[in-house]
């Protein structure tokens, strides 16, 4: 019998790195709403009273980037100078260039393929699914997301008036024989106004944010609750730490339960396989698990810049597969078009759908825009595998 602990974390929408991610994706959406064939690599830095927008954008869209940034900061809840950044008074600097023509020539017309679009860069991407939750996500990251999501909901609807936008969560699960057995430790830190006592904050956080999220069947024995362990968290958000786009790539994916190729998502249009192929491999892995062909599935793809066909495709099922990994890889090649433009068409990615992805995870959420979460090819895979 194997017995081990595994931990994942998430951060709230007011975390400085997530503020940057959301601004980058809000700008991407504003551009795609006007010109869906734009090339966008929008990076954001946010600090006390300051937002810097930089990167490469080639578009026919006419977007007020400064207003988009301010609107995003307002929606998150930074609407008071006491919070260190406020949407009305912060400085916003814009420094976008156009996409390099050397990159564009390989993306616009792949040398190996008449589908017309090569990969925007080399790289490797992973997708993962497992049967630990109904959304086929690992349990620790799933619970971590739900906690910071609930913190934001209770903050915005007035039930926790002392709560401020920045927050972090972390969940440790005990696994027995590879399956979740019980919840061991929950860490939650939430920014707060200076006038609430630590005792009241901890009680409200445990009772109103944490406990409603925990699956009752996994509450066995005493759970260790660590709420605001430093004792005070008034200074937070971009004032507490400088935020940058793309620094929460494990939060964005599987919480460390699966490998990561290293490429961030936010601010990138779908010609960037860092984003689109990570979505596609999640779609593939989720359909394999939904089909009952494995209880855990990892899919890797890789690309060369300017080349449409993936340089490799791999499926790994960790001994849980009903058919061989080689058979599954062949099924993936047969039923999923993993060329960059094939992915865009398969998942309908040329839409302004990305700001919603930029907090609480890109995967495992039941949102109508998240086409990569559909399991519409599970029956096809199952029948073709002969099961």
Swiss-Prot record:
It comes from Dechloromonas aromatica (strain RCB). Binds 2 divalent ions per subunit. Its cofactor is Mg(2+); K(+). Catalyzes the formation of S-adenosylmethionine (AdoMet) from methionine and ATP. The overall synthetic reaction is composed of two sequential steps, AdoMet formation and the subsequent tripolyphosphate hydrolysis which occurs prior to release of AdoMet from the enzyme. Its main location: cytoplasm. Pathway: Amino-acid biosynthesis; S-adenosyl-L-methionine biosynthesis; S-adenosyl-L-methionine from L-methionine: step 1/1. Its EC number is 2.5.1.6. It is an enzyme of class 2 (transferase). HAMAP family: S_AdoMet_synth1. The gene is metK. This is S-adenosylmethionine synthase. One of its GO terms (cellular component) is cytoplasm. K(+) binds at residue 43.
